[in-house]
Amino acid sequence: MERAAVRKKIQMVFQDPYSSLNPKRTIEWTLEEPLKSCTKLGKKERKQKVQEILKIVGLDESYGQRYPGELSGGQRQRVSIAAALILDPEFVIADESVSALDVSVQAQILNLLQKLQKEKGLTYLFISHDLNVVQYMSDEIGVMYLGHLVELGDAQEVCSHPAHPYTKALLSAIPEVEGVRKERIVLEGEVPSPANVPEGCPFHTRCKEAQERCRKEYPAPRKVKEGHVVCCHNVAKV
């Protein structure tokens, strides 16, 4: 498949709406540029497409004549989403796409992403350090540590019954709901350099359950339940 065709099918929403948009170009220019590069639409059709996509993400067509510096963080991220959707992709990578926004604005953007997913049949790869956000947005969750996938499964299953020690520690750090008490798991030691990942299980230097085998042998994926896989020597196979 040619690169141009792949670009049309796969798009990305970046983390920082303050740096992902060209401050010297209008919003209309930013949204129209991909249409010039990847479609054969005429000028009138491109303008119409830009107006339509702005409306879809909740912005008036007048925003097309504005510059990024004239917009709020939430408005900029809506423009970033519009830029990702302007070519009608099938797959969208959202890389920490709400972490730079205020909490109230985060909720608006997440709801918008869900709405667009249902309307357009999109598939998202949603990257985030916030497990509350991940659980809200995802059907499946993959937990990574130092570039290695350590647990994968249904979102509700992983969050309700985590199997990997790292996943358990992450979930224990989520603030408690009133009346619900849980033990906080505090990880000790420093995070190793991703350029020099430890031999064996990459998590063994911070894991309280680590054994000699963990220090020497990388754990193969183990099925703990249908659709739930973990890479840990200390988890029993199903």
Place the predicted regions along the sequence by residue.
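Short helical segment in ABC ATPase nucleotide-binding domains corresponding to the A-loop/adjacent helical element
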Residues: 18, 24-37, 47, 51, ...
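Catalytic Walker B motif of ABC-type/P-loop ATPase nucleotide-binding domains
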Residues: 92-95
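Short catalytic/signature loops enriched in Gly
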Residues: 3, 154-238
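Conserved ABC ATPase "signature" region
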Residues: 44-62, 171-172
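A short, proline-enriched helix->beta-strand linker immediately N-terminal to the Walker B motif
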Residues: 86-90
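Conserved ABC ATPase signature
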Residues: 67-71, 75
